[in-house]
Structures are given as structure tokens and as C-alpha cells.
């Protein structure tokens, strides 16, 4: 299968974090099982527009907000058989407050991935952007994705999504994992001078 993952950042982004790491683990898992995985994300300083890491092809374009229209254009082109997103079989749309509306633009089956509701985070974006973002997250996304499979990482996040209007039966919880402890840990020689 050709699988498209959409996320506003990746782990090479200076502000990338846990959500991006989670999605890259999913991408690596899918790639290791023979799937073609494309990760579409925002560009950032000194990044390459296209790179391949762990069998995942990363395409970067747009900034903090520009990533959304850039991804939409690429999905529409792919829908017309043009570009790197042609022949995509399924989309994983990561909603970090704002979804990519991958189902609408790609015309392909889509899974919506969201770690949590961003109600408390929106005010730091400024009044106008916060109002628009919260409107998209709380009003538009639940309606657009009412028949979409939704994945989240905890029971409280599921309850938040239900309170926004997502159908409970469409929400699956897949808990975050942890990396295994290394077999050996690097150690410094203790000569009594290290405190």
C-alpha cells in the first residue's frame, strides 16, 4: 500500500516533539512491513525539501500555516494523477489542532490521528488565530470527520473528542509506547572527582 501521513512537523523540525515522534514510529512500522510511506510536513530552516529516512520519504513545504494549503494542493494534484501523492491508498491525517482534511482533498480513506484537544493551547496563538483554530477543531472537524476512523492516545482524549461531537464508536485508543531500555548504558569512570 501507498500510505500518506500528514503532520505539521517532523522530528527534524526545531519545534518537533512527541506527536511527531509517535507518527514517525508508526511510519517506520509501516515501512518495515513493506508499505510505501510518504510523510508530508512543513519546511523549516536548512531542511531538505525531500529526504528519505528509515524507508520513509519526507516531503516538506510551507511553514507553520502554509503547510496546510501546500498539502491540500499536493493531494488534489495526486487525485488527478500528478505528482508524488498520486496512487495513494490511505491517508493518516494528524490533527494538531487543525486537521489537513485529507479525506476531502485526497478522496481516499482517511484515519484522523489526534493526541489531545487543543482548547487550552489556542489562546497563545492570538485572538484571531485562536478563534479560527478552535472553530476548525471544535466545530468543523467533528462534522467533516463524523464517518472517519479516529485514533487517539488516551481515555481522557477520547472523552474530549466525544464532547466535541465525534461519534464514540469511531474512536480507537492506541496508547503511546516507550522505547526499550538499551542493553548497556554509557558510563563515565568514577575517579571521585565527578559530583
What are these regions (language model features)?
Residues 129-151:
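Membrane-proximal helix-turn-helix segments that form the acceptor-binding/catalytic region
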Residues 17-30:
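Short amphipathic alpha-helix
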Residues 1-15:
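Nucleotide-activated donor-dependent transferases that construct or modify glycoconjugates
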Residues 59-62, 76-100, 105-106, 111-112:
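Short N-terminal targeting/anchoring amphipathic segment
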Residues 156, 174-177:
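Carbohydrate-associated surface elements
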Residues 151, 189-195:
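Conserved donor-binding/catalytic core segment of Leloir-type glycosyltransferases
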Residues 2-3, 90-93, 105-123, 130, ...:
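Active-site proximal beta-strand in glycosyltransferases
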Residues 9-12, 29-65:
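N-terminal strand-loop element at the rim of the active site
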Amino acid at each position: 500500500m501507498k500510505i500518506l501521513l500528514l503532520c505539521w512537523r517532523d522530528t527534524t523540525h526545531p519545534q518537533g516533539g512527541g506527536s511527531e515522534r509517535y507518527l514517525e514510529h508508526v511510519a517506520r512500522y509501516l515501512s518495515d512491513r513493506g508499505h510505501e510511506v510518504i510523510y508530508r510536513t512543513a519546511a523549516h530552516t536548512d531542511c531538505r525539501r525531500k529526504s528519505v529516512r528509515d524507508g520513509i520519504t519526507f516531503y516538506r513545504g510551507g511553514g507553520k500555516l502554509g503547510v496546510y494549503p501546500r498539502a491540500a494542493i499536493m493531494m488534489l494534484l495526486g487525485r488527478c494523477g500528478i505528482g508524488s501523492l498520486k496512487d495513494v491508498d490511505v491517508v493518516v491525517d494528524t490533527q494538531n489542532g487543525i486537521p489537513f482534511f485529507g479525506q476531502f482533498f485526497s478522496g481516499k480513506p482517511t484515519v484522523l490521528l489526534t493526541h489531545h484537544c487543543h482548547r487550552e493551547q489556542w489562546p497563545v496563538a492570538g485572538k484571531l488565530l485562536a478563534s479560527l483554530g478552535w472553530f476548525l477543531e471544535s466545530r468543523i472537524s467533528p462534522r467533516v470527520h463524523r464517518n472517519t476512523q479516529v485514533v487517539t492516545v488516551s481515555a481522557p482524549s477520547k472523552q474530549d473528542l466525544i464532547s466535541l461531537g465525534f461519534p464514540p464508536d469511531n474512536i480507537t485508543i492506541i496508547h503511546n509506547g516507550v522505547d526499550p531500555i538499551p542493553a548497556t548504558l554509557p558510563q563515565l569512570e568514577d575517579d571521585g572527582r565527578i559530583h
